[in-house]
Amino acid sequence: MLFIYLIVTFFTKMDSVSRIKAFFIMLLTLADQPLTYKIKISQCNDMIINVPYNECFPIYDDCVFGSVLIFQKSDSSKYQVNLYPNINCDENGIIPSKIPYNESGLKITDPLAFYLMFLIIITILLIMIL
């Protein structure tokens, strides 16, 4: 997305207002993408998967079969990750039976730092362009 933005702004005759509009359109397009988290499953040789937030995500692997659900705890800003072995997501994308399983082996990486770094880089590039 950034590459396309740079090509459009460099190779077309755009004034600074149009460049800023294109920049915000690019940010809105990125914001519309589903938020995913990287999950490391230590029971599965530290397998890393990308899981969408608050959706049931099926896992089909040699060492793990089941579903993962990430949700934010209501009492804090921390996220909770539940692994449900041998349970499939239903057609609505939820887990039919809520039986938490061994959360200690799951680690979550918050993508907020990635988005913050991305916005800093975009801002620096925008300042350099304008």
Curated annotation (Swiss-Prot):
The chain crosses the membrane at residues 110-130. It comes from the Eukaryota. Keywords: Glycoprotein, Membrane, Transmembrane, Transmembrane helix. Glycans are attached at residue 102. It is a single-pass membrane protein. It is found in: Membrane. One of its GO terms (cellular component) is membrane. This is Putative uncharacterized protein DDB_G0268382. It comes from Dictyostelium discoideum (Social amoeba). The lineage of its organism: Eukaryota, Amoebozoa, Evosea, Eumycetozoa, Dictyostelia.
